[in-house]
């Protein structure tokens, strides 16, 4: 067990190990998806929100807003994690409601097509279509389409980073903030954090290889900055929206997330980058850990960044 883990996270990992079960990478895709859904089962009854589902082509979006909202709301376009293979509105329901209630925004939660059924670049194209949909239809739905932030966790952080690159390349729609929560930014499995945390925690090297192989199997194709944003050129990074990058100390993805934050800063992008000590990958998402001090403070940071970028009141 990693000695850097805070007591709450060490206890969580001990419970997971005691429960047994096969490694995620040994499961079928459907078994892995069901496992993630089973692990995320928060009580949502205390959240006073409304949710409307909209279907666009091959994917769907949920527009979630405070039940007492009056007037147009700025938008957080949220791209979920799960290795591009797992995750949906159910797995992220509690976290999305926290963002809505604390930031006084509307979350547009994108259920992009999952790999391997929808490999790269289809999930990213779905996210871009969702951004366009907000720009074109938001006003009629009580959304301020001129004030949009993108956010995502893990593989969703990868998609959020790539979406800002794609929106710049295609000259819009405009994005005012990119919030990247312990994001995937490269396919290099030999970074310092990959070496340090390669086995024994809730996300390991074998599992990340399993995810990448289903999203984009070809190593040469993985060099595309829209798949690996860390490989984007300085010119491509210049002029991107301000970034909030949150990383977990005990996470194979830590170093690539922080490296991307540095690359953005070197390109002149305004960046807030914070590592939360003693935490695991996914610590803001895991319902069982939602009340932990580090998870609470990370949410406070995310909300503060969203409020500042979107101009929402206290």
Walk through the language-model features, giving the residues of each.
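Alpha/beta hydrolase fold serine-hydrolase catalytic domain that processes acyl esters and thioesters
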Residues: 146, 161-314
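Alpha/beta-hydrolase active-site loop
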Residues: 118-140, 302
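Short beta-strand-to-loop junctions in surface cap/lid or active-site-entrance loops
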Residues: 61-72, 230-237
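Gly/Ala-rich beta-loop-alpha elbow adjacent to hydrolase catalytic centers
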Residues: 152, 156, 160
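A glycine/proline-hinged amphipathic helix-loop "lid/cap" segment
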Residues: 1-66, 221, 293, 311-314
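Gly/Ser-rich "nucleophile elbow"/oxyanion-hole loop immediately N-terminal to the catalytic nucleophile
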Residues: 135-150, 170
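Short beta-strand element of the alpha/beta-hydrolase
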Residues: 72-82
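Short amphipathic alpha-helix adjacent to the substrate-entry channel of hydrolases
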Residues: 90-108
